[in-house]
Amino acid sequence: MEVTFVKEFTDKSLHIRAMSESGDEMASGTFALKEMRFGGKYITALAVCGLETKPQYRRQGLIRRMMNIGETFGREKGAPIAVLHAFSFDFYRRYGYERVSDTVITSFPIETLGFVPFFGGLVQLTKELVPAFVA
């Protein structure tokens, strides 16, 4: 099956879509340049974002080809490292990625942040302010 990789560029990102001969989107993903603090200074890193393949097109090497395209974009833009928030660490190890940290998502009462300076332009998100975004 013939596959075409459609690439949409901005100055700081690349979105890739793998398309079949019939025009079906088989896989997609985004690679974005982000400024990150690393080793005591800010550097440009390549963020690997939301890679996906439709189930019927898996195991055809589409993600591998998209990773090659995306990582080349990052290198050409001067990004010495790439980062991602993986759904499966084992999946990305085959591409040379290693687990270097964990992220913990937690919630707590806003009152516990009383020690943080308050800037007048900031308001607490409430159901009344943004009902569509708060469950």
Where are these regions (language model features)?
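A conserved beta-strand-loop-helix scaffold within acyl/acetyltransferase catalytic domains
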Residues: 1-52, 135
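Short coil/turn motifs at secondary-structure junctions
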Residues: 34-36, 56, 89
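Conserved acetyl-CoA-binding loop-helix of GNAT-fold acetyltransferases
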Residues: 50-53, 59-72
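Long alpha-helical, hydrophobic tracts
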Residues: 70-76, 128
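Conserved active-site alpha-helix within GNAT-family acetyltransferase domains
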Residues: 75-80, 86-104
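Amide-forming acyltransferase catalytic core, primarily the GNAT-like/NAT-type
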Residues: 103-135
